A protein has these predicted regions:
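A short, exposed loop/beta-hairpin motif centered on an aromatic-Gly-Thr core
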Residues: 26-41
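Short secondary-structure boundary micro-motifs
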Residues: 7, 18-20, 40
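Short aromatic-glycine-(Arg/Gly/Cys) micro-motifs in beta-strand/loop hairpins
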Residues: 12-30
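DNA-contacting interfaces and partner/effector-binding or oligomerization modules
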Residues: 2-5, 9-12, 23, 36
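Short, charged, surface-exposed hinge/linker loops at domain edges
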Residues: 1-8, 30, 44-78
């Protein structure tokens, strides 16, 4: 598994589908790309899809997504 991938991966529970759905928002052509019965399974499947999409970018099969960088905000204890 490539730990250097810089894409976002969203995992949500779906009552309708009774499973976790995985989305890759940096790839707008992909909505919900895979799923899993457990959070861990959904994450594993999501990473597999992400690696395949990354290879497609490297090979020039699909355009490179615009990477959105999020800077964490400092939160002070009150």
């Amino acid at each position: 598994m490539n730990n250097q991938l810089k894409y976002r991966l969203n995992i949500i529970w779906s009552d309708e589908d009774n499973c976790y759905l995985v989305g890759l928002p940096d790839f707008p052509s992909q909505t919900w790309v895979t799923h899993g019965d457990t959070y861990q399974e959904a994450f594993k499947h999501g990473m597999e899809v992400m690696e395949e999409l990354h290879l497609a970018v490297v090979n020039g099969d699909i355009p490179s997504p615009e990477i959105i960088t999020v800077k964490p905000e400092k939160v002070s204890a009150q």
